[in-house]
From Swiss-Prot:
This is Processive diacylglycerol beta-glucosyltransferase. It comes from Bacillus licheniformis (strain ATCC 14580 / DSM 13 / JCM 2505 / CCUG 7422 / NBRC 12200 / NCIMB 9375 / NCTC 10341 / NRRL NRS-1264 / Gibson 46). Pathway: Glycolipid metabolism; diglucosyl-diacylglycerol biosynthesis. Its EC number is 2.4.1.315. Its main location: membrane. Processive glucosyltransferase involved in the biosynthesis of both the bilayer- and non-bilayer-forming membrane glucolipids. Is able to successively transfer up to three glucosyl residues to diacylglycerol (DAG), thereby catalyzing the formation of beta-monoglucosyl-DAG (3-O-(beta-D-glucopyranosyl)-1,2-diacyl-sn-glycerol), beta-diglucosyl-DAG (3-O-(beta-D-glucopyranosyl-beta-(1->6)-D-glucopyranosyl)-1,2-diacyl-sn-glycerol) and beta-triglucosyl-DAG (3-O-(beta-D-glucopyranosyl-beta-(1->6)-D-glucopyranosyl-beta-(1->6)-D-glucopyranosyl)-1,2-diacyl-sn-glycerol).
Length: 383
């Protein structure tokens, strides 16, 4: 593999997933020996104020703007096809031009739908091999552009959707979504139980409560579950210090039944010992769940890519989608009590995993970029 390539990875922090994939690809580049790799949060660098405002509105959409987000997501075909969303096509253009001139990239990798990149190529007449690493289990048309050389997708379902709208089969590769290597390493579970003071003889429910819009009644759910003899609850609060504080009284009363944690770097450890998990249906978290084989309960997914992700996993028997507040406790309790269903769901979610996605993607990107540039040189020689 030619590791002398200059690689530019573009991302945006609308949700953590796109940035996490960019970081994962960067780390894999380092592991493979690439020396000239740059990661750019393009919109943040291009216009910090606008970026901050739109990120805030994005986060608010999980609680107060769901219908607006639904209209945007499902109405994007009309916006995109009629090119009425012209401002989006130009966002970050100046910053992109600066990055291209400074780093002279041989390859551009997008982990967010950066239409500005293929539009820049089209306007400038530059041939910079450009690749989209898609971060969900569904297709959103805003990822698609004639000047994207290849798409790396999670499943055959996404590939089929791309082919339906005219993408050539050779321009799509099913690779899975890149996740941190730690999720694919072997670990001793006994050490994890000991580290977090958990019992291997009880069912463990993991609640990923730090993400926006996961679950609002965490305290109520914990109060109900800690009374059950054979269940332990682990709540990861992330940076949500208010939530962690609100659970401390329950934890003090039931120290062997409830664990409340802040930000956890090695979250894969908790995935490994969890019997099921309540989480947000983001593409990265769901891919991490497939790597470990932990069934997921998805509460009231936001219309758009999260809803589509949730339905994909539910249809394949890998997740339970709960849309009503009062159904959460019953869904959790019945699943944890049903060993057969738990094992079926573990098998189903594990079957969705594709390993070593980052390495597979980067290896193919290098190969494809060389094919593209060789074609360019051949055309020049003949003209």
């Amino acid at each position: 593999m030619n590791t002398n390539k200059n690689i530019l990875i573009l991302t945006a922090n609308y949700g953590n997933g796109h940035v996490q994939v960019a970081k994962t690809l960067y780390q894999e580049c380092e592991r493979l020996g690439f020396k000239n790799v740059t990661v750019s949060n393009l919109y943040q660098e291009s216009n910090p104020i606008v970026s901050e405002i739109t990120q805030y509105l994005y986060l608010k959409s999980f609680s107060i703007g769901k219908q607006f987000y639904r209209l945007f997501y499902y109405g994007v075909d009309k916006i995109y096809n009629k090119r009425k969303f012209n401002i989006y096509f130009k966002m970050g253009n100046k910053r992109l031009d600066q990055l291209v001139k400074k780093h002279q990239p041989d390859i551009i990798i997008n982990t967010f739908p950066m239409i500005v990149v293929p539009e820049y190529r089209r306007r400038m007449g530059k041939v910079i091999p450009t690749f989209n690493v898609m971060t969900d289990f569904c297709l959103h048309k805003i990822w698609v552009h004639e000047h994207i050389d290849k798409y790396y997708v999670a499943t055959d379902y996404v590939k089929e959707k791309l082919l339906e709208i005219g993408t050539h089969p050779s321009n799509v590769k099913i690779t899975g979504i890149p996740i941190r290597r730690q999720f694919e390493e072997e670990m001793d579970k006994d050490k994890i139980y000991e580290k977090y003071q958990l019992s291997p003889d009880k069912k463990i429910l993991l609640i990923m409560a730090g993400a926006h819009g996961v679950l609002k009644n965490v305290k109520e759910l914990c109060e109900s579950l800690v009374t059950k003899e054979d269940v332990q609850v682990v709540v990861v609060c992330g940076k949500n210090t208010m939530l962690k504080s609100s659970l401390e009284d329950i934890e003090a009363l039931y120290p062997n039944k409830l664990r409340t944690l802040g930000y956890i770097e090695r979250i894969d450890e908790l995935f490994r010992v969890a019997d099921c998990m309540i989480t947000k249906p983001g593409g990265i978290t769901l891919t991490e769940a497939t790597a470990i084989g932990v069934p997921v309960i998805l509460y009231k997914p936001v219309p758009g890519q999260e809803k589509e992700n949730a339905l994909f996993f539910e249809d394949r028997g890998a997740a339970i989608v709960v849309n009503r507040h009062e159904e959460i406790l019953e869904s959790v309790s019945s699943l944890l009590a049903d060993e057969k269903k738990l094992n079926e769901m573990k098998k189903n979610i594990k079957s969705l995993h594709l390993s070593n996605s980052s390495e597979v993607i980067l290896t193919d990107i290098i190969e494809q970029s060389e094919i593209i540039m060789n074609k360019k040189q051949t055309v020049r020689a003949l003209s």
